[in-house]
């Protein structure tokens, strides 16, 4: 059983106590580590906004060709108006992450080889990690909400075997490369470098990497770029144009406030984030339904 000391902290186990004298044995090394976050969806980050609040997405439709009529004075002299579509987004998630600490309390727990600055630095890291983890979970929620507006992949939206799933993913990726309006509002093609497959770690761990590379005709290095892994346990695979989903940032400001009368330090991170889903760009999903 862990030993609970009178300051409320928990020791690893009772063997840190000297059996002869009952005191805690000398600590020979103290490792200081902050909790870290990993955002596998940070490729959706569209950058920082310096001024303004409103995001405008503008899409220009593909022009319609006409048959050339020799001798005609109408069709090939009359150009149609460019068809431009716009969407506007202005809902920012304004938030602040913070942690406080007391230098004198930190000194009480450090050995002679450590400094308060080392601990303070890791506290600041933990603040940033908390913010990054929130963005990651927000993006997973955004995908789930956007799914309701997406059209499932038509060729085989519910493959029953892993082999069928891989073939369906390949078909979806190929379909995105051609000009069509099947999974977006207006006819367009998606450049290969903009296509991403978002898949759960639970599902991709069941797939043989060699078979995956062979089926999609890509090498292992390209797999990491094409596939974005998320820590979910569902069987939904999203195929998206990276422009269909994204987030912008503004007011990113990290600072530490010193409160001398209280002998306290507080680290803050201000960070506003705007998330969006735009159907001008292709997005679809496949649901793996094993037999």
Each language-model region and where it sits:
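Generic structural signal of hydrophobic/aromatic residues within well-ordered alpha-helices
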Residues: 1, 17-27, 32, 106, ...
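Context-gated lysine
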Residues: 29, 46, 75, 83, ...
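Assembly/oligomerization interface modules of large self-assembling protein complexes
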Residues: 18-101
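Alpha-helix boundary/N-cap detector
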Residues: 8-15, 19, 23, 97, ...
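Intrinsically disordered, low-complexity regions
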Residues: 9, 23, 44, 48, ...
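Sequence/fold signature of self-assembling virion shell proteins
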Residues: 2-24, 175-178, 183-291
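Alpha-helical scaffold segments that mediate packing/assembly in large oligomeric complexes
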Residues: 99-180
């Amino acid at each position: 059983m862990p030993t609970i000391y009178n300051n409320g902290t928990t020791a690893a186990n009772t063997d840190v106590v000297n059996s002869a004298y009952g005191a805690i044995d000398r600590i020979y090394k103290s490792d200081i580590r902050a909790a870290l976050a990993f955002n596998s969806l940070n490729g959706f980050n569209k950058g920082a906004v310096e001024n303004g609040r409103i995001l405008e997405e503008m899409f220009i439709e593909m022009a319609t060709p006409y048959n050339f009529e020799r001798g005609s004075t109408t069709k090939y002299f009359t150009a149609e108006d460019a068809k431009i579509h716009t969407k506007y987004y202005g809902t920012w998630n304004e938030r602040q992450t913070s942690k406080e600490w007391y230098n004198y309390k930190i000194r009480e727990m450090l050995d002679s080889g450590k400094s308060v600055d080392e601990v303070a630095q890791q506290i600041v890291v933990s603040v940033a990690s908390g913010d990054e983890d929130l963005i990651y979970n927000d993006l997973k929620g955004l995908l789930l909400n956007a799914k309701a507006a997406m059209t499932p992949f038509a060729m085989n939206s519910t493959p029953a075997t892993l082999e069928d799933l891989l073939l369906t993913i390949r078909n979806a990726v190929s379909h995105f490369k051609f000009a069509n309006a099947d999974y977006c509002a207006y006819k367009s093609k998606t450049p290969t470098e903009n296509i991403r497959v978002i898949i759960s770690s639970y599902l991709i761990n069941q797939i043989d990497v060699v078979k995956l590379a062979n089926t999609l005709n890509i090498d292992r290095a390209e797999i990491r770029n094409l596939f974005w892994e998320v820590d979910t346990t569902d069987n939904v695979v999203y195929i998206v144009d990276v422009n269909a989903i994204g987030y912008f940032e503004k007011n990113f400001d990290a600072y530490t406030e010193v409160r001398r009368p209280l002998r306290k330090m507080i680290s803050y991170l201000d960070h506003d984030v705007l998330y969006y889903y735009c159907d001008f760009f292709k997005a679809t999903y496949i649901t793996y339904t094993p037999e």
